[in-house]
A protein has these predicted regions:
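Phosphate/pyrophosphate-binding active-site segments
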Residues: 142, 292-395, 497-500, 523-563
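Structural element of the ATP-grasp superfamily
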Residues: 54, 128, 381, 511, ...
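Short, well-ordered beta-to-alpha junction loops that form the rim of enzyme active sites
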Residues: 166-170, 218-219, 394-398, 553-556
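Thiamine diphosphate
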Residues: 105-118, 267-269, 310, 319, ...
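N-terminal alpha/beta PP-like core and its mobile active-site loop of ThDP/TPP-dependent enzymes
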Residues: 1-336, 384-387, 459, 468-471
Length: 563
């Protein structure tokens, strides 16, 4: 198995090992004794940290990594991190042991601990089946390399995703012949698919003739080199680009054609919409589109087959490599002159709107400059970070302010989890830093998200494996997303009247201190606006010196409810 993972380009094993892994440990030790070190093994005290780190590592490097967990219980503890990797379509290889299948010592690896009886469950794979592209149990060690190759082939084929392999100790203890030849090249990922030429011409014609064309995307920028294709097409036709709930940086955010982060503000009067690499371009109940609007869905997964109830009223759903499709569309615009007055008018209108949106954000920042708030924190960071720094955003209800006040322009400098399970930021920052050790990594998170991410385990790992990063906690003392949804549904309800919401956990805890206790990190707390800039500078200096730092920014609490 390790041979095959090495052949497939895996460089890091994020592991939480148990009694099902003695042969893995023995194999790694044997390799080390022979001076063969193809992997960096990162021991993670919690499975959430292992998988979030592997996810972000793949997002930054473009190469899938491997996660090892302990039988059914370790698989379950992956929890929401598995949801995120699945929804983000990130390639990750997961291996879990299975409880031994012999009772009386019939084979090497037979049961020898009471826990192994309790871990014998009817269908371990049912825990992950809804969240993986492929799952398989190793039935003989003789074809385990083929199983790894098969899993990695599927993980890397668009739409990419998580694969899960499991094996019992008896199988993993089988003795095989010496190292096998590298056969990974015989198991390549799918080649990218293109639009039919006639459809490319149709979409190009629709774009060129539209009064207001808009493109909406969330994860087009998952490969940073692709962003240039989107910029080129947008500039060619004067098309506004909306990053709806972005997972990556998809379009330079200071570009005049960047139309913000809420498609609902832009598409209601659009007559042509390209939905490109986006799962949720808008919420149907809160938007009214033009009855004559033309919509094309361009995606590796245009029908969102893993989402039971989903719909975009498109006239064509195009299952293609989106970057290749945009290049085809632009090539089909050869009839459009470079000085077309319609394009110039669209570009001017978009630029005017862009300036207005920026002015609105600046005015909001100025109004609240004397207080601690997400805008002021993000703006302060914007003045301190270099262009190559990677920002991991898990601020949830503050994300819009972070996006507007901490704009990133360089592809590969912004990440989000891609799913809806909180707790990605800490482990994700470790993976990002290990994938890009020369770049600064900054995690922006809420206090709820910070705690979901198991910060004690995060900072143990970050310290041991020299992956320092800065965490900035937007600490409002609770779960603001839950509060906001309550107020939307029950604006005049009883809960709203007396602030009895059961979503607050106060601001008494020393959240930054967890980093100091677990990994020797620098722990700072900001309580006054004038402390913000100097403490953020101090924290960034610590990170540059090889030490994690956590800055706990105390925002106004979302609820004053007593326990």
């Amino acid at each position: 198995m390790l041979d095959a993972l090495e052949h497939c380009g895996v460089t890091h094993l994020y592991v939480n090992l148990g009694s099902d892994h003695p042969e893995l440990i023995e194999s790694l030790a044997k390799r080390a004794a022979a001076g063969h070190h193809p992997f960096r093994v990162v021991t993670c005290p919690h499975e959430n940290v292992a998988l979030t780190a592997a996810q972000a590592h793949a997002m930054v490097s473009g190469q899938p990594q491997a996660v090892f967990v302990h039988v059914d219980v370790g698989t379950q503890t992956l929890g929401g991190a598995l949801h995120n990797a699945f929804r983000a379509r990130v390639p990750v290889f997961i291996f879990a042991g299975e409880t031994p299948f012999t009772l009386n010592g019939e084979l090497l690896g037979s049961r020898n601990r009471p826990a192994q009886i309790l871990q014998d469950v009817p269908d371990q794979h049912s825990v992950v089946r809804a969240y993986v592209k492929w799952s398989m149990s190793v039935r003989t060690g003789r074809n385990i390399r083929d199983l790894v190759y098969r899993g990695m082939q599927l993980a890397r084929s668009e739409p990419c995703g998580v694969v899960y392999l499991s094996g019992a100790r008896e199988v993993m203890s089988e003795t095989l012949d010496g190292p096998a030849a590298d056969q990974a090249a015989r198991w390549p990922a799918l080649l990218p698919s293109a639009l039919r030429p006639a459809l490319a011409r149709e979409i190009a014609g629709a774009v060129s003739q539209a009064r207001k064309p808009v493109l909406v995307t969330s994860y087009f920028g998952r490969r940073p080199e692709r962003v240039a294709a989107l910029v080129q097409l947008a500039e060619r036709v004067g098309m506004m680009v909306v990053e709806e709930s972005p997972v990556y940086l998809n379009f330079p955010r200071s570009h005049p054609l960047h139309a913000g982060y809420q498609a609902a503000e832009v598409v209601s009067d659009a007559d042509l919409i390209l939905v490109v690499d986006c799962d949720v371009p808008w919420i149907n109940a809160t938007i009214r589109l033009s009855e004559s609007v033309r919509i094309y869905q361009i995606d590796t997964d245009p029908l969102k087959e893993s989402i039971p109830l989903w719909h975009v009223p498109a006239e064509a759903f195009c299952q293609v490599d989106s970057a290749l499709a945009l290049e085809q569309i632009e090539a089909a615009l050869d009839h459009l002159p470079n000085d077309d007055p319609t394009v110039a008018a669209r570009t001017r209108a978009a630029a005017t709107r862009h300036v207005e949106v920026e002015a609105r954000a600046k005015a909001r920042l100025q109004r609240s400059a004397a207080t601690l708030n997400p805008d002021s924190v993000a703006a302060c960071l914007a003045s301190l970070l270099d262009d190559d720094a990677i920002v991991i955003d898990e601020t949830v209800t503050s994300s819009m302010m972070v996006l507007e006040s901490l704009p990133r322009d360089k592809p590969g400098t912004y990440l989000a989890s891609g799913g809806s399970s909180l707790g990605f930021g800490g482990g994700g920052s470790i993976g990002a830093r290990l994938a890009a050790p020369d770049r600064t990594v900054v995690c922006l998170t809420g206090d709820g998200s910070y705690l979901f991410g198991v910060p004690s385990a995060v900072h143990i790992v970050a310290s041991r494996y020299r992956a320092p990063f800065l965490t900035v906690i937007m600490n409002n003392g609770g779960w603001n997303a839950t509060k906001q949804n309550l107020l939307r549904l029950r604006p005049d309800g009883y809960a709203q009247r007396d602030d009895r919401l059961w979503v607050g956990f106060g601001q008494e805890a020393d959240l930054a201190g967890i980093a100091a206790a677990a990994g020797g990190g620098l722990a700072l707390t900001v309580r006054e606006p004038e402390q913000l800039a100097p403490l953020l500078r101090q924290a960034l200096e610590a990170v540059r010196g090889g030490r994690c730092a956590v800055v706990d920014v105390r925002l106004p609490p979302i609820t004053l409810q007593d326990p």
